[in-house]
A protein has these predicted regions:
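Helix-coil boundary and interhelical linker segments in multi-pass alpha-helical membrane proteins
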Residues: 1-7, 67-89, 120-129
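Cytosolic, membrane-interface loops and tails of multi-pass inner-membrane proteins
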Residues: 22-52, 108
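Hydrophobic residues within alpha-helical transmembrane segments
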Residues: 10, 59-63, 125, 129, ...
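Hydrophobic, well-structured mid-protein blocks that either form specific transmembrane helices
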Residues: 79-113, 118
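C-terminal ends of transmembrane helices
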Residues: 20-23, 97-107, 134-142
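Interfacial segments of multi-pass membrane proteins
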Residues: 46-50, 72-76, 93, 111-141
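Alpha-helical membrane segments and adjacent membrane-interface helices in multi-pass membrane proteins
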Residues: 51-76, 87-99
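N-terminal signal-anchor transmembrane alpha helix
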Residues: 2-27
Length: 143
């Protein structure tokens, strides 16, 4: 039980990493929450800071979910039947951390890329197919 609590805390703290907020401070010295939509997420980062910062924030947001599901979950000694459950739990808590981050007043992003990272960690082939489909639709329809 103690290991499960540790996984939950570490996953939440990992999900709470405010990558968009840090990108705004590092690239332009601004608080991203005061610009664009005011959201601390990847979309607002692309809109306000440009594609380079947007790609960096997207990568970190994706990594937060993947890392929690793939590595933090391994703290719990797992039986093969429970590995997916523990990985999903760690990932979901990372998404909650992204949406309600401790480090930035519990106001975060929407969690889509962090959830995508969880999918990459738990069901990588399905995640890659879904992301590929999304990108094809995005670039062909521009919507």
């Amino acid at each position: 039980v103690f290991e499960v609590v540790i996984v939950c805390v570490l996953s939440y703290l990992t999900g709470s990493i405010p990558s968009a907020l840090w990108a705004g401070k590092l690239t332009r010295g601004i608080d991203i929450r005061e610009h664009g939509s005011g959201n601390v997420g990847t979309t607002n980062t692309f809109r306000v800071l440009g594609w380079k910062a947007g790609v960096a924030v997207a990568s970190v947001d994706l990594w937060k979910g993947w890392f929690s599901a793939q590595y933090i979950a391994k703290i719990v000694p797992h039986h093969p039947e429970y590995h997916v459950v523990v990985s999903m739990m760690a990932g979901i808590i990372a998404v909650i951390g992204h949406m309600f981050p401790l480090y930035s007043g519990f106001k975060g992003g929407k969690g889509a890329l962090t959830a995508g990272g969880v999918m990459l960690g738990v069901v990588p082939i399905s995640a890659l197919l879904a992301m590929g489909t999304f990108l094809v639709l995005l670039f062909t329809t521009r919507y």
